[in-house]
Amino acid sequence: MCGIVGYIGNNEKKQIILNGLKELEYRGYDSAGMAVMQEGELSFFKAVGKLENLANKCTDFESQGYGFAIGHTRWATHGKPTEINAHPHLGQYSCVIHNGIIENYKEIKDKLEKEGVSFLSQTDTEVIVQLFEFYARNLGVFEAWQKTIKELRGAFATLLVTKKDPNHVYFAKNAAPLIIGKNANKEWYFSSGDAPLIGSCDEVMYLEDLSLGYASKDELVVYENDILKSLCFSKLSGDKAYAKKDGFRFFMEKEIYEQSRVMSEVLMGRIQGDEVVFDELNNEDLSQVDEITLCACGTSYHAAMASAYLFERIAKVKAKVEIASEFRYREAIIKKDSLFIVISQSGETADTLEALKIAKEQGAKTFAICNVDNSNIVRLAHLSLLTRAGIEKGVASTKAFATQVLTLWMLAIFMAQKRNLNVSAEIKALLHTPNCVSVKQALHEKIHRLSKRYLDGHGFFFIGRDVFYPLALEGALKLKELSYLHAEGYPAGEMKHGPIALADSKLYTIALMPKHMLYEKTKSNVEELIARDSTVLSISPLEFDLSDDFIKTNEQDHYMCEFFEMMVITQLLAMEISIRLGNDVDMPRNLAKSVTVE
C-alpha cells in the first residue's frame, strides 16, 4: 500500500510534493521519492526510510516557476525497501510512480528482456516505464501510454512524466484510488487520497476504474474504457482527519472495509491458472517437510491456530502451534530440518523474535509470515512471505489477521501441490474470498442495531469448532480489546466441561455455526446453552429459530469462505458495541500496536 501525489503549476513544487506525501505517510513509509520536470529537464530524488530522509536529500533543490512534479511514499510489496526499488522508477527519458500491484509484471519483464531491455530494480512498477518507452519507439506518447496500460493486469494508480513530452503528466487508474484536484489558479493536483488536496484544491474528480489520460497547464483529458469522458468535479471536504479515514468514523472501520481490496492484493500474482505460486519460494523444496511448528502472539497466534488445521487437512503435514512467550522459556525440542513458521504483523514482536532465534539455533528451517519487509523477523528467517496488508492504524488488528490467515492458507495449498495433492476446490475458494469480506451496508446496519442488546451482562462466550474455534478466540479478543468487557473463546464441544456453569440470561453467547463444518454438532452445543438461558446471537447461513438474535450469512461452497465472512461480522460487532460504550476504537486503553518488549 503506497501513496502518490502530483502537481502541475507555478508554485514551489518540491515543497508541495513533500507536504502531500506527509499527508499520505500513513499509507506506507519504508521509502519515498519525487521527480520534477521543469523547462524540459527532469530531476529526481529517492531515499529509504522516513519522509524526512527525502526532504534532507533535496534541501538545496529549488523548483519555482511553471512545471510539474510527482511523488511517492512506498510500502514494499515487490522488492526490498532500497533506494533502487524506491519510486520514481526511471527509463532512459521517463519516470513513473505507482500504487498497487502489477499482476503480470514477470510476463512483461520477460518479454522486454528478450527485446534487450535492462531492468535496475526488483519491483513490478519498473515494467510500466520500460514498457512505455519500448512502445514509444514507434508510437506517439499518448498512444504508447494507452498501449502500455492496456497490457497491465492488476491494481494500479500511476503517474508518468517523460522528456519526450515535457508538457504533460500522464495518468491511469484501475482498482486503486486516484483523485484529480483543481483550484482557481489553474493548478492541477493528483493524489491517492483527499488529505493532500485539502487547502489546495476547491474541487476534485474521483477517477473510475479503467481510466487514463493526460493533463497540462491548460487541459485535462480523461478516457474511461476508451471513451472520452466529460469532466465532472465535486466539492472537496475540508476535514483532513476525516479524509485520512476516507469518510469512516475510525481507522478500524476503514480497515474492516478495506479487507476485500487487501485480500485481492494478497492473491495478485500468486495464483496462475489452477496453482498457487510464490516467486519467493521458487528455489525451495518444501515437499519433504513432515512437521510444522507455528509460533506467534495475540491475534497472530489465532491465525497460526487456524492455519494448523489447514496444513494438516490440505497438505497432510503434521502441525502444532506455540505461544511465543511460552515457547521461548520451556526448553522446547524442535525437530531438526522441520519447518518453524513465525507470524508477526510488525516483524518486531519481542517474544516471537526470540522464539525464531531459538528455532534457528536448533537447526529448524525458519519461515516468517509478516507485513513489514526488512523487519527483524524477516531478515532473520530463512524464508518469508509478505502479507501485503498495508499500514494498519487501528491497534486492534483486522486486515492484518485476515491477510495472515489467507497467506498461510495459500502456503498450505502450495505445499499440497508439491505433494501432488488435489487442491482445485481450495483454489476456487481462494479466488472467492475477497467477495466474502465485502461489507454490505444492510449487514453493518443490522449489527449496529443488535449491538445495543450486548452492553452489559457478566461476560461473552464466542464458540466454534475446527477453524472456527480460533476465530471464536479472535472474536473474543477483539471484543475484550475494544469494549473492556469480559469475553472468552471456547471450542463448542468444551461447554459441558466447565464453562456452561456460567450460563444465564446475562451470559451472551456468539455462536459461529458454519454449514460446511460440523454444523449439527455446534447446533447441539448452542441448544444446551439456550436451555440454560444464555442469550445467544447465532451466525449461520442456516436458519436457527431458537437463538435470541440471528445474523444470516451467505451460502458458501467452502468452509474458509464462511470463516472470512463470519470474521467480518465479529469485527463489526466488537466495534459497534465499543462505540456504543463510548470507547476510542482506534486507541483502546493499555494497548500498543507493536509489542517490542516482554
UniProtKB/Swiss-Prot annotation:
It is an enzyme of class 2 (transferase). Pfam families: GATase_6, SIS. Its EC number is 2.6.1.16. Residues 277-421, 450-588 form the SIS domain. One of its GO terms (molecular function) is carbohydrate derivative binding. The active site is at 2 (nucleophile), 593 (for fru-6p isomerization activity). It comes from the Bacteria. The keyword Metal-binding does not apply. Keywords: Aminotransferase, Cytoplasm, Glutamine amidotransferase, Repeat, Transferase. GO terms for biological process: carbohydrate metabolic process; fructose 6-phosphate metabolic process; protein N-linked glycosylation; UDP-N-acetylglucosamine metabolic process. It catalyses: D-fructose 6-phosphate + L-glutamine = D-glucosamine 6-phosphate + L-glutamate. This is Glutamine--fructose-6-phosphate aminotransferase [isomerizing].
